[in-house]
Amino acid sequence: MRQLRILIFFISFLGLATLNAQQKTDTIKTKESYGLRIGVDFSKPLISFLEEGTKGLELVGDVRVLNNYYAAVELGYEDKISKEDYMNYTTKGSYIKAGVNYNAYKNWVGMTNEIYVGMRYGFSIFNQTLNSYTPNVKGTYFIPTEVLPNTEFKDLSAHWGELVFGMKAETLKNLYLGFSFSFKKMISTKEPENFKNLYVPGFNQVYLNDTGFGMNYTLSYLIPIVKKEK
C-alpha cells in the first residue's frame, strides 16, 4: 500500500507539470537541454535506518544521447543480514548496472519528464557469510539444534539482465523525482559448494527460476551541458 501511494504521488507530479506546460506558447524551433543527470536512490538510506542489519547506497546517472534515448548507469553496495527458515547469513558486496532507456512520453515545450522502458546488464562481486543454520530434522527422536559455523565464502560473482519501467518528473528547475520497477533474470553466478546464492547485491532476493524484482525511488539533478534544437 505504501509503494502504491508513492507511485500515485509521482504520477500526480507528472500530471501537474504537464498542465503548467500547456499554458506556454509553442514556437517553430525550440532548444532542449542535453547533459549529465546524477542522483541517489533515497530509499536505500531510509531502509538502512528502519531495518536492522541492512546497509546500502545506490548512485544513479544518465546522459541524453538522442532525442528520446538515454544511456543509464546505477552503482552501489549492500551489506545485508538475511534470515531464512533454517539459516542466517550475511551478504556484502558491490554492483554496477548499465544500459539504455527509451522515453515514450511526449513532452510539451520546455518539459523534460519521462515515462520510459529500458534494459540493463548487471554485475556484482560479493562475499557470503553463513552465520548459523538449523538442520531440517523432523521427528520425535531428534531435536533440531542451531549450528554456528561463521563460514565466509569470498570472491563470488553474478551476471544478470533487467527489463525496467519507470518515470521521472521535474519538480524544480533541473531537479527530478523518479521511480522505477525492474524484472531481473540471472544469467550466471559463481556459488560456493553446497550453498546457493539466495541474495545478490543489486539483484536482491533470488527467486525460483533465478528471477528477481526491484524498485527504486530517486532524487537527481541535471547538469546541462549543451542545448540542441528539437
Show where each model-derived region lies:
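Short glycine/proline- and aromatic-enriched beta-strand/turn motifs that initiate or cap beta-hairpins
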Residues: 21-64, 74, 220-230
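Glycine- and aromatic-enriched membrane insertion/assembly motifs of diderm outer-membrane
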Residues: 49-109
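Short loop/turn motifs that connect adjacent beta-strands in outer-membrane beta-barrel proteins
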Residues: 23-34, 68, 106-114, 171-177, ...
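Extracellular/periplasm-exposed beta-strand and loop segments of Gram-negative cell-envelope proteins
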Residues: 48, 76, 80-93, 126-137, ...
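Transmembrane beta-strands of outer-membrane beta-barrel pores
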Residues: 42-46, 75-81, 102-104, 121-127, ...
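Membrane-embedded beta-strand positions of outer-membrane beta-barrel proteins
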Residues: 38-40, 61, 73, 98-100, ...
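Outer-membrane beta-barrel "beta-signal"
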Residues: 97, 101, 209-230
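Residues that define the transmembrane beta-barrel architecture of outer-membrane proteins
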Residues: 34, 53-57, 92-96, 113, ...
